[in-house]
Amino acid sequence: MIGPERVFFDTAPFIYLIENHPEYYAPVSEYLAMCASREKIFLTSVITIAEFGVLPKRTGNLILLDNLTNMLRELNFQVVEINQDTAQLSSTLRARYTFLKGIDAFQLAAAIYTDCSEFYTNDKPLKNIQEIKVTVASK
């Protein structure tokens, strides 16, 4: 790959940061700082926004949505749309990896389609995906 490395962030790391998770806030924050110091490009997808928004809307804690929007903007995250090519890749991944859930397949497909070198998550089974390096948040 030519140019800076691209890292795709799954939904869980945003939840940990914005909600100050007692176990995962520090490691996710440190990982993000390390990536920033290496001038990596940050990406996520519209699926992250959809997944993240469920609990704040259910509980009425809409400030969390503002916090996500601000974080994405302040850290210059590129938010990837899902298109037909991504959908096709998603179905290919689900066909290959029978344990893969639909949402995870879309997130991974978005990362692969946008030439990310790494996928950052806390979903340990995703480490079995061969098409992209999967890094799991650790305590």
PLM feature spans:
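A generic structural signal for short hydrophobic patches within well-formed alpha-helices
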Residues: 14, 49, 87, 126-127
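Short, well-structured N-terminal submotif of metal-dependent ribonuclease cores
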Residues: 1-44, 57-66, 124, 139
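Conserved glycosyltransferase catalytic-site signature
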Residues: 11, 46, 104-108
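Short loop/helix-cap segments at secondary-structure boundaries that form the rim of catalytic
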Residues: 124-132
